[in-house]
């Protein structure tokens, strides 16, 4: 089913309204960047590069770096985004856009600035191996960036088990719910697991409430639908993910609530999306019965709907 992401997102965005966000005031404007910022501060990564069109976000990053003794540099660029993107980014049509570079070493920032392509936007990524290594990504992930598509390792019609340390599926409108910020070579990548364990230790000390939220949320069972290209960059624009507050036993998932994650660009078309009726039924329901070709959604003992599974639809993952 093809639908506009913004139509579904507007209808169901309240489903995620209670999702935890950092209560620490110094982090409240750093949505989606905390893991990378703390990784650079703790020398777990040498460099963090991001992009924003928000002067508020730029100021928050400057304040953080000044407070924590990090170097920040930025470079303006001209991005010709359409009106839907402008509305999504909540900015004026001709507002400034910034590539932002954060590190402890000025020479790394200078090197990264030379490598950045003009016109980098949320739709594009850097595919240079040299750039990936400069950012401190694991060498195995960098080497396999354009060779391995980790989504293909998650099989349809079954239950996929992964470690919560490598759960990078909760991107898009919930991209604060993650540890790794790079494309993985596999869900069992030892170097990524080691890095993310260290990042979690920093969270536990620095932001204990957020730490407790993450280790619980990243372990929740989920269903996802793949939309469009399955590239390793920008999973946030290819996945629709439903996270269940519940427990999966054998083929039955009993749950109390559903959290919905949509592509970060809500103007995109979802070419492979559950219908509004299917979403409404899962939000209303409290139990899923997982069959090979279908998922039955129940409320109490009443069958609400059957959701078809496919090669790219309703793929079940149970992190632990």
PLM-predicted stretches and their roles:
Residues 128:
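Generic structural marker for isolated residues within well-ordered, non-membrane alpha-helices
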Residues 2-119, 137-143, 147-320:
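A conserved ligand/cofactor-binding region detector
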């Amino acid at each position: 089913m093809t639908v506009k992401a913004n139509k579904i997102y507007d209808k169901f965005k309240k489903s995620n309204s209670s999702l935890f966000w950092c209560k620490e005031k110094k982090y409240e404007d750093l949505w989606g960047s905390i893991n990378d910022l703390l990784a650079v501060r703790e020398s777990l990564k040498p460099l963090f590069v991001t992009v924003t069109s928000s002067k508020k976000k730029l100021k928050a990053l400057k304040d953080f770096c000044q407070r924590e003794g990090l170097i920040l540099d930025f470079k303006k660029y001209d991005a010709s985004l359409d009106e839907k993107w402008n509305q999504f980014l909540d900015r004026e049509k001709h507002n400034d856009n910034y590539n932002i570079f954060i590190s402890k070493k000025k020479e790394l920032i200078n090197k990264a600035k030379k490598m950045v392509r003009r016109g980098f936007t949320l739709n594009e990524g850097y595919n240079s191996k040299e750039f990936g290594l400069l950012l401190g990504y694991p060498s195995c992930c960098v080497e396999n960036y354009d060779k391995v598509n980790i989504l293909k390792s998650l099989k349809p019609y079954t239950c996929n088990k992964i470690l919560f340390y490598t759960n990078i599926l909760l991107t898009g409108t919930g991209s604060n719910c993650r540890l790794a910020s790079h494309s993985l070579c596999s869900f069992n990548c030892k170097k990524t697991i080691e890095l993310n364990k260290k990042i979690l230790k920093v969270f536990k000390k620095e932001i204990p409430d957020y730490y407790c939220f993450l280790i619980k949320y990243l372990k929740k069972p989920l269903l996802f639908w793949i939309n469009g290209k399955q590239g390793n960059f920008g999973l946030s624009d290819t996945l629709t993910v439903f996270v269940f507050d519940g427990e999966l036993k054998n083929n039955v998932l009993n749950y109390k609530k559903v959290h919905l994650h949509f592509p970060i660009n809500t103007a995109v078309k979802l070419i492979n999306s559950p219908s509004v009726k299917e979403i409404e039924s899962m939000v209303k329901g409290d139990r899923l019965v997982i069959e090979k070709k279908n998922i039955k959604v129940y409320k109490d003992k009443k069958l609400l709907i059957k959701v078809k599974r496919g090669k790219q639809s309703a793929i079940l993952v149970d992190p632990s």
